[in-house]
Amino acid sequence: MKVHQIKIDFNVTEQIKRFVYVYILEAESLYLIDSGVYGSETKIMDYLDSIGRNTSDIKGVFLTHAHPDHIGSAAWFREHSGCKIYASEGERLWIEDIDLQFKERPIPNFYNLSGKSSKVDFVVKDGDEIRLEGGAVIKVIRTAGHSCDEVSYLVGDCLFIGDAVPVKGDIPIFIDEQEIRKTMNILETLEGIETYYPAWDRTYDREMMKSRLADAVEIIDMLKNTVLELDDGTDLETLTSQVCDRLNMQMLKTNPLFCRTINCLRGGAIMTKS
């Protein structure tokens, strides 16, 4: 099975530019790992045309989690190709009801990024194996923490990890300290994986992934230790500002997603979908 990586550029605001990677698994049929933001179907379909494939070849979209830059064009592909949508139970509610997601996790430009709600045809869980046309198997591995029930997808010796790993130089976004640490341990101890496919960077071999995981644990520990040192029971907004000043992250002071990270590190309520 051949893997194609497509970079999707988008803007959260006019000033905040981001990107995400969508992956295409190509065999007799095609399968997407995540779907980018709303409107990504145009770039994806242009790419498919360049390799001699078309919409009807897409049989499934496997979503790692429910955030807008991953689910944005899922509804479009389901409608136009008849493909099935796969996601975990914990992420399903926000995929099937983006209004609920906006209510519980508002971000700028939300609806322009997330597009439309999409039905999840198949709910997956840790350990599930889905047999694709042509005989390939996708195995589901729960890698929560960044979101409440994120999953990674293992195909042969390739692991598609979405946003499971915090990245140096980017906004550390996770909602559950225990889960994110558990995920780092799971990814470190998995055997037989040769290539890792993140949603936010080029592919990694095993040694590079080992380094990225060490960086991620360092980020989590640094934030945790800073929170423990500074937290005197003050309100969350003030604590977040103090952490940002201490770590020279002033640009994150008003970022609501980073504020949630600080909240979980001080032992605040875990924000899950209900």
State where each predicted segment sits.
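Conserved beta-strand hairpin/beta-sheet module of binuclear metal-dependent hydrolase folds
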Residues: 1-51, 151-164
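Metallo-beta-lactamase
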Residues: 39, 137-222
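Residue-level marker for buried hydrophobic side chains located in beta-strands
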Residues: 31-33, 62, 85, 158-160, ...
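Accessory terminal helices/loops
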Residues: 188-195, 202-274
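Active-site HxH/HxHxD metal-binding segment of metal-dependent hydrolases
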Residues: 39-42, 49-130
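A general structural detector for well-ordered alpha-helical segments in enzyme core domains, enriched
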Residues: 44-47, 73, 180-183, 223
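Short Pro/Gly-enriched beta-strand edge/turn motifs at strand-loop
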Residues: 1-10, 108-112, 134-135
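A short catalytic or substrate-binding loop motif that flags glycine-/basic-rich loops and adjacent residues
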Residues: 15-18, 123, 134, 144-146
